[in-house]
Amino acid sequence: MRKNRAIRTIAGVLAATLLTGCGAGESENMNQESKVSSDTLYVQKVENLPEDFIMGMDASCVPALEKGGVKYFDFDGTEKDVYEILSQNGINYIRVRIWNDPYDANGNGYGGGNCDIDNAVEIGKRATQYGMKLLVNFHYSDFWADPGKQMTPKAWKNMGIEEKCEALYQYTKESLQKLKDAGVDVGMVQIGNETNGAMCGEKSSDLGGWARITQLMNAGSKAVREICPDALIAIHFANPENADSYASYGKNLDYYQVDYDVFASSYYPYWHGTLENLSQVLSKIAETYGKKVMVD
């Protein structure tokens, strides 16, 4: 892949081995003493990484984990802010997902970290404090958005496409303004999550579906350009093992003139094919459309 077209990333998931979930409501037994075994894990270092390599990690659940009693320690056994530990060990980007309203009518969180904008601001401030940039991942849903489900947020449920685009634009703009006002260093904004032919309740299988999906994407991009003009804009898909699908996504983004900088892809090796295929698929996108590509 062309050197000047690739954003080089390693995506990680921050996990706590003493937890079965990351919702604050799942932490009833956190104060009970647990037996933990210790062992050595060795990962061979990748040599000669370029200076612009993005070493990223999704840390969206950290506040919920900490509320459940989780603490973090460095290699010397000293308790520290986990974001300081990450920064000291080469992480330079923190990815945080944002759900519109991850709570039921009684104010109970859906779980998964209850990742609303306030959670993102808290994470962003701490990441920025330790010299890391934030990748803001808007799902435009009240809970997980993925290829199997792209549900419209409750507040937007009965909106037509024009009204929904305006709501998405305003929500994106207001959320980014909150991050900006808090002094967060936003380096990239992801418009949607794993938007494989669907986003925010719109489906490509419906007549005019891609036109509506890309209209929503452009509404989000407009807000980013206005509030965070220096941030990169990413559009995100999954299942790179389906090369024809990725080619189709690229064509639709180009045809409908979506304003974006980075074509981003999930990559789970168990499901998503070989690294060779991933490289070929993303290289084709970069070469065809002149976009940066990224795995996150």
Place the predicted regions along the sequence by residue.
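Bacterial N-terminal signal peptides that target proteins for export
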Residues: M1-I10
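C-terminal motif of bacterial Sec signal peptides marking the signal peptidase cleavage site
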Residues: T20-G21
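N-terminal substrate-binding region of glycoside hydrolase catalytic domains
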Residues: E33-E122, R126-T128, K133, S141-A167, ...
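Acidic (Asp/Glu)-rich catalytic clusters
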Residues: V46-E51, D81-G90, E122-Y130, K178-V184, ...
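Structural preference for beta-strand elements that scaffold enzyme active sites
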Residues: D52-G56, N92-R95, K133-L135, D185-Q190, ...
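Active-site beta-loop-alpha junctions enriched in small/polar residues
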Residues: S60-V62, W99-D101, H139-F143, I191-N196, ...
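Active-site cleft segment of glycoside hydrolase catalytic domains centered on the general acid/base Glu
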Residues: G109-Y110, C115-V121, A145-K251, V258-Y260, ...
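Active-site clefts of carbohydrate-active enzymes
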Residues: C200-G201, I235, S265-Y268, T288-D296
